[in-house]
Amino acid sequence: MKLDLGSPPESGDLYNAFINALIIAGAGNGTIKLYSTAVRDFLDFINKDPRKVTSEDLNRWISSLLNREGKVKGDEVEKKRAKSVTIRYYIIAVRRFLKWINVSVRPPIPKVRRKEVKALDEIQIQKVLNACKRTKDKLIIRLLLDTGLRANELLSVLVKDIDLENNMIRVRNTKNGEERIVFFTDETKLLLRKYIKGKKAEDKLFDLKYDTLYRKLKRLGKKVGIDLRPHILRHTFATLSLKRGINVITLQKLLGHKDIKTTQIYTHLVLDDLRNEYLKAMSSSSSKTPP
């Protein structure tokens, strides 16, 4: 994140000054929330002037983060990775704060093993859609598959953000703070038109909390034997988009990735599929060819 935060005050409340500097510099809401939480946690732990922090203070703080119980849902591997990612972001935030106040001590940034990208195939998608008995549930699945929206982005969509004439949605509450446009199919438009009938422009499209959405998808997935979570549908959108010919730069814009390297993870997944199909086909043909 390349933001000009200016210089810190010589005295006074460094924490609030840092957060205000982030806001003035145009940091996204997600960044501000993360940095404020991480730096507050760090300051509460060391309980001293941060300009006098030592390497020992930093090591004790990181150790305390590692020993805390996480609140992430999922299996043990998923929980462990999520915790590692959170700690990494906390450390990045505190490093930025310490650099801003001209403290030379820096905590090392731990590496996090890349998470395996899972996506549904066409058969699994149809199974999930068939398991939806309510228009609302089917619309949620279709929108996530059509748009690749993050769960929190979907839950922030208002009725007025939807353009039925042009099959598009204006996404305002994004991870990087930048608005973007996403699109949906005619089939999804029919569901949308039916679902929003009678709703006001300022109404939320789905008046749900993240936990409620998460549990809803898990229940739907359980019906058909699939581990269904919001981000798996985002991965599915990205993977299918590339397979259907959308170029990686366009996909980057649709997904709202600042760094194209994040988007390129999906190109590797598609290449793996192509390689497997090639090897399967060549193996089959060679077995039929006489020596």
Swiss-Prot record:
The segment(s) forming the Tyr recombinase domain are: 115-279
Could you list this entry's UniProt keywords, alphabetically sorted: Cytoplasm, DNA integration, DNA recombination, DNA-binding
User: What Pfam families does UniProt report for this protein, alphabetically?
Assistant: Phage_int_SAM_4 (PF13495), Phage_integrase (PF00589)
In this protein, which residues make up the domain named Core-binding (CB)? 9-102
Q: Which InterPro entries match?
A: CB (IPR044068), DNA_brk_join_enz (IPR011010), Integrase-like_cat_sf (IPR013762), Integrase_catalytic (IPR002104), Integrase_recombinase_N (IPR010998), Integrase_SAM-like_N (IPR004107), Tyrosine_recombinase_XerCD (IPR050090), XerA (IPR033686)
Q: Which GO terms describe its cellular component?
A: cytoplasm
Record's subcellular location: Cytoplasm
Does the UniProt entry include the keyword DNA-binding? Answer: yes
Subcellular location, principal: cytoplasm
Tell me, which GO biological process terms does this entry list? chromosome segregation; DNA recombination; DNA transposition
Function summary:
Site-specific tyrosine recombinase, which acts by catalyzing the cutting and rejoining of the recombining DNA molecules. Probably involved in the resolution of chromosome dimers. Binds to the dif site.
Its family remark reads: Belongs to the 'phage' integrase family. XerA subfamily.
Please identify the protein, giving its name as recorded.
Tyrosine recombinase XerA
Organism name: Saccharolobus solfataricus (strain ATCC 35092 / DSM 1617 / JCM 11322 / P2)
